[in-house]
Amino acid sequence: MKIKPKKNIFFVERKPHWLSSRQGYFTMERNERVDEFPKSFMSSLKKDLKSFDLRTYPDTHLIYEEVSRWLKIKNNQLIIHEGADGGLLRVFEVFISGGDRVITCNPSFAMYPVYCKMFGAIHCPINLKVKNYNYFSELKKKIIKTKPKLVAIANPNQPIEVMLNIKQIEEICKLSQRFGSLVIIDEAYYHFNKITAQPLITKLKNLIVVRTFSKAFGVAGMRIGYTISNSKIIGLMLSIKPIYEINAFNMKLVRHLIKNIKIMKNYVKEIHKGR
């Protein structure tokens, strides 16, 4: 008997990475950090890595305490995962079933349509235009028309940059609540613009904020991200997490990044100067 995968998988096409070797190359469209980390930072990180870290399973509750303290939220409003896409995948795993409608922008983060196909969701993209485009108005119309299960918004979006302000995000969430829709605000580039939906997570019960350490912090190779939301949504996402959602090295790396937050802030300043 021939073994077949789930039907949805037949609709998923993934292109292989074009680089046969990464040595000496940067993928600029993914906004990888091109500047070296300070030698003092690298030296301190290396000294902090012990043989014990390699031999034992990670004690993850410590990093939850540190990251939640840094973000000024409660432990039960946070889940850590592999990159921003790890958070998006958890949301799809918990909330999205076959036939559910999902609104995203197009073009935007490449994994949105992939996850829609994986879970049999109906992808309802908003096709962005470069000039004279009322993105906020079109988004509201799309929500009313499609009555989606999920609205996933990269804020700011890229490669075509559109962005919602806090009042607009709140309005989108309240509109979506009328249809029982979740709203993901993907804040991968939040540190470059300082507009964040984080203050709204306790007020709006359908809001999920996803972030990554890959962009402003510049550690894309380590695949670290996190999601913040109300405790109910986070509790559901935690119920399907792996046994250990972050490894021992990455926990120490995150601690050093937070401790040396000026490295990130200075990098962001340099990026702004170059624009």
What are the language-model segments listed below?
Residues N206-R275:
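PLP-dependent aminotransferase class I/II
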Residues K2-G83, R90:
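N-terminal small-domain helix-loop-helix segment of the aminotransferase-like
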Residues N31-V34, A84-D85, F109, N155-I160, ...:
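Short glycine-rich anion-binding loops that position phosphate/pyrophosphate groups of nucleotides
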Residues V94-I153:
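PLP-dependent aminotransferase-like
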Residues K131-T146, P159-V219:
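Active-site pre-lysine segment of PLP-dependent enzymes
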Residues T104, P125, I185, V209-R211, ...:
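Hydrophobic residues in well-ordered beta-strands that form the structural core
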Residues K74-L78, G99-R101, E187, K205-N206:
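Short acidic capping loops at alpha-helix termini that bridge into adjacent secondary structure
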